[in-house]
Every structure is written in C-alpha cells, then in structure tokens.
A protein has these predicted regions:
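Transmembrane alpha-helices
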Residues: 113, 169, 173, 205-238, ...
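Hydrophobic, membrane-inserted alpha-helices
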Residues: 65-72, 87-90, 151-155, 215, ...
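C-terminal transmembrane helix and the adjacent membrane-cytosol boundary/short C-terminal tail
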Residues: 188, 264-323, 545, 584-619
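Transmembrane-helix boundary motif in ABC transporter permease subunits
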Residues: 70-75, 89-103, 112-141, 392-402, ...
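Interfacial loop/helix-cap signal at membrane boundaries in integral membrane proteins
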Residues: 1-64, 334-385
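Generic hydrophobic transmembrane alpha-helix motif, especially the helices
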Residues: 108-111, 115-122, 128, 138-175, ...
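Short cytoplasmic-facing helical segments at TM-TM junctions of multi-pass membrane proteins
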Residues: 179-225, 501-549, 573
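Glycine-rich helix-loop "coupling/hinge" segments at transmembrane-helix boundaries
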Residues: 158, 187, 230-273, 289, ...
Length: 619
C-alpha cells in the first residue's frame, strides 16, 4: 500500500513530518495569539506549574479591539468608506457569533499568504532573470492553474495526513502560480530607461533588483498578493475536506445537514471577509508611496498608536469583565449559539420559494434535463473517439496550423487512451453547455453596460465584487432550487463563469478607438449597425480571451459540482479521497485530464486571437 511505501522511506517521512509540524505550529501560534489559550504560556513554563496555575492563560484579542483595528486600517488605506466596510464587516462577524471560526480562517490566510508571496516572488524573479526558466515555468503554471483543487488533496493526504497543515499545503500549491505570473509580468513591464538609470547610478545587480526593479513593479506584485489572498479564501471550504478548521468547515457541515440558513450565514461571512481583504489589498496596491514626506514620529504612526492603545484599553475592560460574567465573557467572544442569526428567516424564505414555485422550478428542471441536457449528453457519449479527435485536430489545424493541431491532438489522445474517456465526455458536455450560456450572457450584459463610461465602471465593479466570492458559495442557492441534479451544477457554473465573459467584453468594446466610432456615425450607420459591424468585430479577439477564461472557470465549477453529485471526472476525483492505495495517482491523472481540456481550448483560442489581432492591425 502507498502508506507503507512512505513508511519505508525514513528520510522522506521525516521531511514531510517536519513540514507538517512547522506549518501546524505557525497556524496554532497565530490562533492562540488571537483567540487566547495556554499553549503559548506552556512554551515558557513547565506543564506542572501550568497545571497548578490554571488561571494563567494568554488573553484573547477582544473583538471590539479588532473592530477598531479594521476601521483604522481601512481609513489609512482608503478613507472613510473603506473604514466603514472594515469596521461594519468585523462587527457583523462578531455579533453573529462567527468570531472564532473567522479567526481560524484568517489565521489560515495569515500563514499561507506570506509563504505564497515568498515562493511566488522568488520564482518570478528567477523567471524574469533567466528566459529558459520562464519558458520552463509557463507549462507548469498552466497545468497548476487549470487543475481542479480536489486533485491536489489526495496526494497531500497521503504525504502529510489530515489537519490544518494539509489544507495550508494544498492552498500554497494552488495560490502560488498567480503570484509567480504577476511578478514576472510586473518586472517585464518596467521600461528599459528605468533599468538604465539604475545602472548609471552605480547599482549592483542586487541593488538594482531590490531598490529599483521590485519597487517599480510594486503595483503588479501587490496585485499578485491580492490574487493569492482571494485564492486562499476560495480554498477554505475545499481545505475543510482535509481537516482545516474555520468557516469552511462550518459551511460544509451545514450543507451536509441541509441547513441552508446556517450555510448561508457561514458563506456570507466568507464573502464578507473576502470583500474586505480584496478592497484593502487593492487600496494598498494603488496607494502612492511618498518618499519625501517629512513627518514626526506621532504623525507617521498615529493610527498604529491609536490601535495599540485601543487594544490595551479593550483588553483591560474585557479582563475586568471576567468578574461579572459567569461562564462566557461576551467582550472576548460571542458564541455562535448566543449571537444574532437570520438562519431561520432564510430557511423560511427557502420553504416559501419551494412551496410557491415548486411546479415551475420542477418543470424547468425536467425540461432542461430531458429536452436539452439529455440529448446533448447522448450525442457526446455516442460520438466515436476517432471522430472527436479528427474534429478537434481539424479545428486546431485551420486556426493554428500543423503544430497546433498536433499539440491539441496529442493532449486529447492522452485522455482518449485512458479508461475514463466516457467520464471526460460527460465533463465536456457540461462544460460546453455552461460555456455557451455564460459567454452569451457575458457578451450581452457587457455590450449593454459598455455603451457609457459610467455603465462600464458599474459593471466592472459588480464583476470585482462577484469575483471575490469563493466558488463553493455559488452552489448554495441552486441546491435548494433544483436539488442535486446536473441543472444545479450547470446554473452555478453559468453564473460563476459569466463574470470573466462580461469583464473581457467591456474591456474589448472600450478598447475600440473613438475615431472609428465617429467614422461610423459620419457614414450614416445606426447604433446597432455600428455595434455589429465595427465594435464587435474589433473587440472580438479580446472577447474570445474572455471566453477562454470562461472555459477555465466552468471546468473548475463543474468539477466542484461533484460535491452535490455528478457523474463526470469530478466525481471520480472526489471518490479518490477515500482510496488509500491508488487514490493519489488516480486524482492527479484525472486532474491532468481536466487541465489538458482547458489548455487545449487555451491554445486554440489564443492562437486565433493573435492571428485576428494581426489581421485587424491591433497587434
């Protein structure tokens, strides 16, 4: 068995144990620091002394002090609006009884994000300095970013066991690639004049890197940090399958018990934390650094001093309040059973929707399954392997030539030669339907809002908001509307994947030169004619890149749909979690199949977009 194989290799076993213990120590230390406990005290005193003095514990950070801290940090980064977002968000999490699981989730993020940052920055710098390294990194990053998250869990369980450390390792593997890409992109964008100025100033290579290049690429690098944080929060539910504590585990337990109200509360907390961290990190990335300000010590650190003072004051008040509370000190933490809740209202709303619209929803579900999805599924499963390979290679040849055709054909042949071809076809059919619907939705919505500058800003802000949602959250509303069917998964995938299609449509239409708009108007074309004959053709290469992103988003959601029951590759990946002997190999292989599907589409679409841009004179 695979576990015995690892047991035989003492050095490898000790290596994985060391990593697990190190990560677990860091996560536990941060949680104890914020939530209180005796483990930090235990480091400095003996167990016997601690047993005799059980009153000696590390005090928890009062939620009141944390709320003030979030308000002050938001004010420092973005003014009163961001301050209110941080303060009200922290207040909501606290009084609704989700303070402890939220801190458990944040401790998870606080440990994984710096590790991802260091790894991503290091590999990004290496790739920037050495073109061969960058060339080698690109296919690896492509596979890592398109492989389903579940595929990583099985080998991580085999190597590192279960617990918070296993969830953090999975998150590090998934969240590091975007940091590498953003670092390389930011360093490449630096103009040669900046590099020459640094060299002319007498900088060594190290000084040039750390005092010129990295500060100049600061915005792109911090955008990478933002992406890393969003990936970490998107993983909190999936990490709960390998033992990670926090809001993700609460959400998973609530869904398993079909407690939609409790699941919605936990999901809303995850979304709220994601929105706050997203806005904070974006404000940090966009904040201009004043290198010439001449401020006193108090002026420079006044908010930090106020925060430190507030922690001291609220901690003293909370400590004194221990004498007034019998069992639970509500100034430290409000337990979930004592906090406010709107779960019963959500449950009542779900019951009302189900009772009122049962026949409509059921009829729509049956129609979609029997008249659309069923025939489409049969058509995919009935198509011969040779015909499928010929079709995909033919499309690739027409768009990109013999090299693209052979590359795409090789990837599809790798899938076809396995015994999972039928499951791959089911995945393809679900992804195809969702991509078509999401692309149409995105193009229509993006085209409507892109007509004015104000509309573009509004819809891009909406896209930013929805992109902060962890993917698992999209499954919550569709489960109670359509039960556990392919319809639920596909609707969640369509909503999730509409965001990139909308964003790229707006970007593409806004990139059309104003002079062409005016030329069309002067030629006497109507508004519809200008949109169909000028704007859409010129924006279509960019729109197709959005469709490319839609494919990746759709595949991720379709695989995630295995949690509520599907028959595709995702179900097999999910099932591999319980197979000790061959589970890791099966999960990685199936995850690679999904990755190859996404990469095949990416190769074809990007090649077409490049050729189309050249033909239109946009490249």
């Amino acid at each position: 068995p695979i576990f015995e194989m690892y047991e035989e290799k003492a050095a490898f076993r000790e290596f994985t144990k060391s990593i697990s213990k190190g990560l677990l120590f860091l996560i536990t230390f941060v949680r104890e620091l914020l939530l209180g406990g005796d483990k930090i005290i235990d480091v400095f005193v003996s167990d016997a002394w601690l047993k005799d003095n059980d009153w000696m514990t590390w005090p928890a950070l009062p939620w009141t002090a944390a709320t003030v801290g979030a308000f002050l940090l938001g004010f420092q980064l973005g003014g009163i609006r961001l301050a209110l977002l941080g303060g009200i968000g922290s207040l909501y999490v606290s009084i609704f009884g989700n303070w402890v699981p939220s801190i458990q989730t944040l401790s998870f993020v606080l440990i994984t994000t710096p590790i991802c940052f260091v790894l991503g920055l290091s590999f990004g710098i290496w790739g920037y300095l050495d073109r061969k390294v960058e060339t080698a990194l690109q296919p690896v990053l492509n596979v890592m970013q398109t492989m389903p998250q579940f595929a990583y869990l099985v080998p991580i369980i085999a190597l590192f066991g279960l617990g918070d450390h296993a969830g953090s390792i999975a998150t590090i593997v998934i969240a590091t690639p975007p940091m590498i890409r953003n670092t390389i992109l930011g360093l490449k964008r630096i103009s040669p004049e900046v590099v020459e100025a640094g060299l002319m100033s007498g900088c060594t290579k190290t000084q040039l890197l750390f005092k010129v290049l990295i500060p100049t690429a600061r915005r792109d690098i911090l955008n990478g940090v933002n992406t890393v944080i969003m990936q970490c929060l998107a993983m909190v539910v999936i990490a709960s399958f390998v033992g990670a504590k926090g809001l993700g585990l609460n959400l998973k337990i609530a869904l398993n018990s079909l407690k939609i109200g409790k699941a919605a509360e936990a999901g809303f907390c995850i979304v709220l934390i994601a929105v706050i961290l997203d806005r904070f990190t974006k404000a940090w990335a966009n904040k201009q650094v004043d290198y010439f300000e001449n401020l006193t010590f108090f002026q420079r650190y006044k908010l930090l001093i106020i925060f430190g003072t507030s922690i001291l004051i609220f901690s003293i008040i909370a400590f004194i309040a221990n004498g007034y509370f019998d069992k639970i000190n509500y100034l430290y933490v409000i337990p979930i059973e004592k906090g406010f809740t709107f779960a019963h209202y959500i449950d009542a709303a779900v019951d009302w929707v189900w009772e009122t619209f049962f026949y409509s929803l059921n009829s729509f579900n049956k129609f979609l399954l029997t008249e659309v999805l069923g025939p489409m599924k049969k058509a995919y499963l009935g198509m011969p392997v040779v015909a499928t390979l010929t079709l995909t290679m033919g499309v690739a040849y027409i768009i990109g030539g013999i090299r693209t055709s052979l590359l795409v054909g090789g990837m599809m042949l790798f899938i076809a030669m396995s015994k999972y071809w039928d499951r791959a076809l089911i995945t393809m059919y679900m992804a195809t339907f969702a991509v078509i619907m999401a692309s149409l939705n995105g193009i229509i919505v993006g085209s409507i809002f892109a007509q004015t500058e104000r509309g573009s800003k509004i819809i891009l802000s909406v896209c930013d908001f929805f992109e902060t949602f962890p993917s698992f959250v999209y499954l919550i509303p569709v489960i109670f509307l359509f039960n556990i069917t392919d319809t639920s998964v596909l609707i969640a995938a369509i909503v999730y994947a509409t965001v990139p299609a909308t964003r790229y449509t707006v970007w593409g239409l806004n990139s059309v030169p104003l002079s062409l708009h005016e030329a069309g108007t002067m030629s006497g074309v109507s508004r519809i004619q200008r949109w169909t004959n000028i704007e859409i053709p010129l924006a279509f290469p960019t729109i197709m890149l959005g469709v490319n992103q839609t494919v990746v988003f759709t595949l991720q959601m379709v695989i995630l749909g295995a949690l509520i029951g599907t028959e595709d590759l995702g179900q097999l990946i999910f099932g591999a979690l319980s197979r000790a002997q061959d589970g890791p190999g099966v999960a990685i292989t199936l995850g690679l199949f999904v990755s190859l599907m996404a990469i095949s589409v990416d190769v074809i679409v990007r090649k077409w977009a490049e050729e189309r841009k050249k033909a239109l004179g946009l490249a």
